[in-house]
Structure formats: structure tokens, C-alpha cells
Curated annotation (Swiss-Prot):
Domain named Helicase ATP-binding: residues: 190-374
Enzyme Commission number(s): 3.6.4.13
Top-level lineage group: Eukaryota
Protein name: DEAD-box ATP-dependent RNA helicase 37
Gene name of this polypeptide: RH37
Keywords: Acetylation, ATP-binding, Helicase, Hydrolase, Nucleotide-binding, RNA-binding
Amino acid sequence: MSASWADVADSENTGSGSSNQNSHPSRPAYVPPHLRNRPAASEPVAPLPANDRVGYGGPPSGSRWAPGGSGVGVGGGGGYRADAGRPGSGSGYGGRGGGGWNNRSGGWDRREREVNPFENDDSEPEPAFTEQDNTVINFDAYEDIPIETSGDNVPPPVNTFAEIDLGEALNLNIRRCKYVKPTPVQRHAIPILLEGRDLMACAQTGSGKTAAFCFPIISGIMKDQHVQRPRGSRTVYPLAVILSPTRELASQIHDEAKKFSYQTGVKVVVAYGGTPINQQLRELERGVDILVATPGRLNDLLERARVSMQMIRFLALDEADRMLDMGFEPQIRKIVEQMDMPPRGVRQTLLFSATFPREIQRLAADFLANYIFLAVGRVGSSTDLIVQRVEFVLDSDKRSHLMDLLHAQRENGIQGKQALTLVFVETKRGADSLENWLCINGFPATSIHGDRTQQEREVALKAFKSGRTPILVATDVAARGLDIPHVAHVVNFDLPNDIDDYVHRIGRTGRAGKSGLATAFFNDGNTSLARPLAELMQEANQEVPEWLTRYASRSSFGGGKNRRSGGRFGGRDFRREGSFGSGRGGYGGGGGGYGGGGGYGGGGGYGGGGGYGGGYGGASSGGYGGEPPSAWD
């Protein structure tokens, strides 16, 4: 098997490290205090990059020891503690000496502590910008994606980032991120948002929607950074707030926004429950322009009068339908309508999600003014990029059947970081039990669910993404929005009750135009899902088992939450309809749509192709491994 991109990067890092040691034989490698005087390990411990050394403010790469200095990356280039010196001390241990890239004299400036992920760009990969997402977007898969826009005076799309005036610093970060050209949602959404228009965008995770709303927000704040905000109190006044349904998604958006806002002067802070609020309060007191938060924690901060919505210019809701489905509607309405938030039309409001059923659109329309509706075809959620398999498995046989699948992957050499397996279950107890059973049977696994502390969830996700535990057992807490690259196989151990939840689950694989595999265990307890599941598979030109077709013909397909709206788009603009009546097709029409006389319109959806060659190995459309990396998800 050819070496992966990560393997090549590791070998380059090793080579770079040896070269540096040879060129400076008289200077021993820095050893953190907690590792000193310990016996040598059997394998050498890879040194951390300079910017990751906790409490180490030593000289930037290639510089000399100098008093104070004016380094850009690590607190002015002098001292062992970049955050502990006296302001304006001039030199010595910890002094920033009036240096720093903004040339201020004295005082404390948050930007001086900003880690520079690009400092060693010429010699080694940047962890924050390259190793984080080891997938390269397959642009060929985006060429034929259906896109629909509706609304008044829709700005034309762009084809390159060079056509967009985002500001020099942000454009530099985009180039450093190695973003080649905009994804479809970015091509359309960014010009709309730069025009100051409200937007409702229907696009699933993996399509680049985080960058689609982060770029215009950061650019807008950069152009008006000197706005006067009230002073003299402990209340902070962010200019933008981004709401997300889960802690994990909030943390992910925060990390992306921090990456995009590097050296722009835009300060990004995250706030979510499950962690001590005091630490988040201290971060807020240091200044905030963009606040990424979950609805519950933001309400808490508003009630404590530690955050005010008075100066908000941008309001973004990511996974908006999920937040409403999870019961956050009262909290969201309180934030938007009852606090000191500027009214719609004064602020700019952005709603992004993978699905926008008509009921959700009614509620969301209360937050928007003269908005543009953007629908981007499903990329990586229910297309030919994902091979969907449904197998009839009794509850008592599920574990042994899962073991057969995992053994088949292992025998075909499909394992490790490039082929992660995500297993969805319905209950927290079931997640813990299955994780333990897999570990006992020789398959390293971890799990996340609502009863895990935030720290436990973050540790589990990190272990899964790195490939140390290539199997993650999860409840729906991980189904929406999480950025987990390399998921090659999604197993619905327990099928959800909602077909949209199924769509979101399998959307964890086949991301960024790459191939993926989704396996579902179906039995008599899932009969209500039979018909929408069969129709969903038909839409993507998947093979529907005969037994599932029989179940589908027997099951009743009423309204409820298993009625998917919008067909291949996951949602449509209800303003195009005379009413909220049912039985009409999506954008691609032909009289299709669920319950509307004749299956999916537009010639049967996405057209098949690819697949995994009939087994878990030997993929004929990309396969599990061997593909280089990207930061687009």
C-alpha cells in the first residue's frame, strides 16, 4: 500500500528535526520540566513544535536570543514565559518589551500571544492547517451538483477567491489553508453575504459551509474594526454570534474561525456548557468579536449580563433545524427576540443546515428579512458517492454481524487512520456496552454520548480522528456537524426513527466528493422507516433489497417526521409555493417528490456509479485509502 500523506509528512518532520540537531550541535533540545530526569523511553518522544510548548516563549525559529525583540509568533521572541513578564519590561525572562507585531509599548495585547501556525511553513506541515484535515476535496464530484437560488436580486456566483474582496490578511490565510477554489456553497453564499443580504442555505456538512459564513463575517468585522463599544463594565459586546446545537460543533466552528482570523485582529471566543464557566468568562473579558456558542450557555451569559447582543451585526445559526428539533426554539427566540439583539434588517442573519423542512422554514423566516434561499445538492449524504447497504439483522445477531464486517475490513487491509468506522446506536448505555464488547474482542474502540463529560468527549474524538481507536460508537450527539475526516464506513447498528437523522448519519462518510460506505441493520422494529429508506436509496441509484421493497409496500407513509422535503436538496423555498400544501416535487421536478405521484422527479436523482467493488477492499471509485489530504470539510 502506498504511503499516505500523513506518513510522508511524518517522515519529513523527522528529517527536519535531525537536520536541525546537526546544524546546532552545541544546543541541546529543549526538554519540558515535567519530562526532565526521567529514564529514556524505548522510543524517542517527538518534540512538540515551538509554538505548542506550554509556557515556553523562547526565540522564534532562526532568531538569536535578544532582549525583548519584536518577534511575531511567540510573545516578542524573548523569555521563558510569554505571558508572565511585566508589561514594558524591555528584556529578561518573560518580557515582551514593547515588541510584538503591533508595536505597542506596554500593556497586554492578546494578539502577541497568538500562535503562528505558518511559522515553519517552508520546512514542515502546519498542524493547524494541514494535519487537521487529511482529505483532498474531489472537485470533479462537484461539477454536476444541482444548485438553486431564489429571492430578489440574487448576486451572481464567483469562480475563484481572487474575485472576492475579503481583505489581504484573510486572503493570505485562505492561501495558507491551500484552498484552491470555492466549493459550490461558497461560490454562491459568499457573494450573497458580502452584499449584506440575509441567507437561508441548505447544504450539508462537508460542503465547506463553515468557511462560507466565516469568511464574510471576518471580512465584515475587519473592515469596521474600530467600532466604538461601551466600556467600564464587565459586559462584553461581540459583533457576531454563531449558534450551534452541540458543544462539539461549537468547538469545531471556533477552531475554524480562529484559523481563518489569524493575524486579522478579529478575536474569536467559544462558550458552551459542560465546562467551567469561569474560564470562558476570563476569555470573554480579554475581548471578543465573534462569539461561537450553544444556546443554553449563551442564555446563561446573557442572564448574568456578561454578554450583550446590543452591537451584533451578524447572527449565524448552523444546523438550524437540529437546534429546533432538539428543543432549543424557546432559547433561540429569547436570544433573538427578547434580549437587546438588533432587529432583523439591522443585523444580518444567516441560517445554514443540511435540511430545511417547511415547518422549520416558517419558524426561521421570523428571523430573516428579504432573504435569499440557497439550496445545494446533497454532496456526500445520499448520492452515488456513498454506497448504501441495508441488511436484515435481528437484535440478537447485531454484535456478531458487526464483528463480521470489522473482520472483513481487517482482512482486506483496511484499517487505521485512513479508514475509520463510525457505529451509531440509539442509547447511551448501548454505546458504553458495545464499546466495551468491541475492546474485549480485539477491536480498539471509544464512544461519545450525552453522559460523557466534555473532556471525555474531546479525548474520544481526538483518539478516533488520529486512528488510535479507529472505531467510534456514538449516539446522535455525533450525527450532526462534526468534522471527522477519513470516515470510510458508517454502520447504523440501531437505525434512527427519523429519515433525516439517517441522512445526517451516513453523511459522516463520502465527504468532500470522496467515496464512502454506509451499512444499516434493519429488522421488524424499523418498519416505519422502510418506505422513506427505500425511496432514499432509489433516489441515489442504490440497489434496494427485495425484502425492503416488500416492507415499504406494507408500511404506511403518513406525514410526521419521516416525510423528507426537498428531495435531492433537503429543502426548498416555500415562498415559491402558493401554500404549504404537500405532494409537490423538489427543484428538479417532473412531478416527483414524496407522496406526489411517482417517486422522485428529475430522472431518478443522482445517477449511480463507483462503489466498493463488491467488498470492503478494492474500491473502484476511490476506495478507503491512498487519497491525499485537505482542510475543506
